Amino acid sequence: MTSTDVSSGVSNCYVFKSRLQEYAQKYKLPTPVYEIVKEGPSHKSLFQSTVILDGVRYNSLPGFFNRKAAEQSAAEVALRELAKSSELSQCVSQPVHETGLCKNLLQEYAQKMNYAIPLYQCQKVETLGRVTQFTCTVEIGGIKYTGAATRTKKDAEISAGRTALLAIQSDTKNNLANYNTQLTVLPCEKKTIQAAIPLKETVKTLKARKAQFKKKAQKGKRTVAKNPEDIIIPPQPTDHCQNDQSEKIETTPNLEPSSCMNGLKEAAFGSVETEKIETTPNLEPPSCMNGLKEAAFGSVETEKIETTPNLEPPSCMNGLKEAAFGSVETEKIETTPNLEPSSCMNGLKEAAFGSVETEKIETTPNLEPPSCMNGLKEAAFGSVETEKIETTPNLESSSCMSGLKEAAFGSVETEASHA
């Protein structure tokens, strides 16, 4: 620690302004007024202060680097001038370190010098035949200072603080001798920035922090599976596939009729439940394969088909079916007057199997008479019950086959016919 640092630290701690304020209040004088004069450039300014008390001006020493020190110097000069009179010599001439402010000054000095707070340690001293006394030791800046023995602990701490201040001031005797004065606050040289010793700085290497956001799935890239079991087949679109559940299909009148393969299917597996199909008048009649189906498997339940007058009559295969299997229950078919009469195969059926129950057929006057095969049937099997047929007057007479039947089998009972 240099002498200039010590002198500047101690001079800034003194409270000459406070003592001058107390003096003005004691003698009912106006409050001291301070004026500051700034000299030099802005980067290296010098301050000088002047205090006015009771109309008298007191100038400080020149060359201070701050205003506070300049004002303290002006207050000290004022107190020195006032101490020359005999009345004020007692209260003014007493040094600052002789008063109780030395502890405060020492603490301010430690703060300005970046020292630790002064630590006071008091000890009790006992001597035979004398009053008990106390001694105190203060530590500041790593140096311990011990004061004189006193009767109380408070006085012992003040004595230790005064000892420390006097020791610090003793280092600045040379500076005080140069000015040949007893002033405490003196200007000092400004501190120069010394070349700092390069220190090895340990720079910590920053570690890369992991990203906290979730990784997005990379689209368009496929990973190759090591095991064939791990392969995941994505679902394929089903736009081109047929729906398993059959839907109701509404057909237009231009659709073609059922294929003949439907007849083969029913002929092979017997009765098959089929859906009711409403057809338009332009559709063709059922295929001839339906007759073969009934001839092979006997009675088959079929759906009722409503046909228009333009449809053709049943195929000749129906006669073969009845001739082979005997009585067959058939559906009632309502025909229009334009339909042709029953085929000649019906006569062969009755001739082969005898009496056969047939449905009553109402015909119009334009129908042709029964075929000649009816006569052959009666000639072969004798009396045969036939249905009553109402004919119109325009119908032709019985065929020549009726005569042949009576000649072969004798008298035959026939139903009365109305001509």
From Swiss-Prot:
Q: Which domain of life is it from?
A: Eukaryota
Query: What upregulates it?
Result: By abscisic acid (ABA).
One term of GO molecular function: miRNA binding
Q: Which UniProt keywords apply?
A: Nucleus, Repeat, RNA-binding, RNA-mediated gene silencing
Q: Where are the sequence repeats?
A: 247-274, 275-302, 303-330, 331-358, 359-386, 387-414
- Signal peptide start-end: none
Report residue spans for region: 6 X 28 AA repeats of E-K-I-E-T-T-P-N-L-E-[PS]-[PS]-S-C-M-[NS]-G-L-K-E-A-A-F-G-S-V-E-T.
Answer: 247-414
Query: Where does the entry say this protein is expressed, by tissue?
Result: Expressed in rosette and cauline leaves, stems, roots, flowers and siliques.
Keyword Nucleus attached? yes
Q: Which positions does the motif Bipartite nuclear localization occupy?
A: 207-222
What information about domains appears in the record's comments?
A: The dsRNA binding domains (dsRBDs) 1 and 2 are sufficient for the function in miRNA precursors processing and mature miRNA generation.
Task of the protein: Double-stranded RNA-binding protein involved in RNA-mediated post-transcriptional gene silencing (PTGS). Functions in the microRNAs (miRNAs) biogenesis by assisting DICER-LIKE 1 (DCL1) in the accurate processing from primary miRNAs (pri-miRNAs) to miRNAs in the nucleus. Forms a complex with SERRATE (SE) and DCL1 to promote accurate processing of pri-miRNAs by DCL1. Binds and assist DCL1 for accurate processing of precursor miRNAs (pre-miRNA).
- Entry protein name: Double-stranded RNA-binding protein 1
Q: Which organism is it from?
A: Arabidopsis thaliana
Identify the taxonomic lineage of the organism of origin. Answer: Eukaryota, Viridiplantae, Streptophyta, Embryophyta, Tracheophyta
Q: Gene encoding this chain?
A: DRB1
